[in-house]
């Protein structure tokens, strides 16, 4: 077994704070969050409704900026990126699957799988989509 303790974490948050609102209505959503998620590691994020889970995920994806602290993905500090660079970085390195996602009903299974690959710049998205559908036993459902 190798020691990966020195490896760059897939996601690293250090001292992350986020408040929303103004003045007396200001609410502290995230308070001094430190979190390291290693490559290939899976975690569960649980808590009651309104506890900041979705907000934390938005900060981790660079869709919401923390007030203080740092957020790094694949060793890249997101706070150092302007909006255009952040959008490009997200397109290459960050994916989000929302709780209620749906396939596009007017598209085939092949097209539904190929579209995000095309958006990510995959050269032969349809061939890759066929491979991925075959890998999960859905070759017969391409059309």
Predicted regions and their residues:
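A short, flexible loop at the N-terminus of ABC-type nucleotide-binding domains that lies
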Residues: 6-10, 19-32
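Helix-to-loop junction immediately C-terminal to a conserved catalytic motif
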Residues: 61
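Short coil-to-helix segment of the ABC ATPase nucleotide-binding domain corresponding to the Q-loop/switch region
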Residues: 107-116
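The feature captures the beta-strand-to-loop junction immediately N-terminal to the Walker
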Residues: 46-48
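Conserved ABC ATPase "signature" region
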Residues: 76-77, 124-141
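ABC ATPase NBD coupling module
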Residues: 24-27, 78-95, 119
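Conserved beta-strand
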Residues: 13-16, 28-38, 69, 136
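Conserved ABC transporter NBD signature motif
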Residues: 69-77
């Amino acid at each position: 077994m190798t020691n990966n303790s020195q490896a760059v974490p897939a996601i690293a948050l250090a001292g992350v704070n986020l408040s929303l609102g103004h003045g007396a209505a200001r609410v502290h959503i995230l308070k001094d969050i430190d979190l390291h998620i290693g490559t290939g590691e899976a975690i569960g994020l649980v808590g009651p409704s309104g506890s900041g889970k979705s907000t934390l995920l938005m900060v981790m994806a660079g869709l919401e900026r923390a007030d203080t602290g740092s957020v790094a993905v694949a060793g890249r500090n997101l706070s150092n990126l302007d909006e255009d660079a952040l959008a490009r970085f997200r397109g290459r390195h960050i994916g989000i699957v929302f709780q209620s996602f749906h396939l596009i009903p007017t598209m085939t299974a092949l097209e539904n799988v190929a579209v995000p690959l095309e958006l990510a710049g995959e050269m032969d998205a349809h061939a890759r989509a066929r491979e991925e559908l075959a890998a999960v036993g859905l070759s017969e459902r391409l059309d």
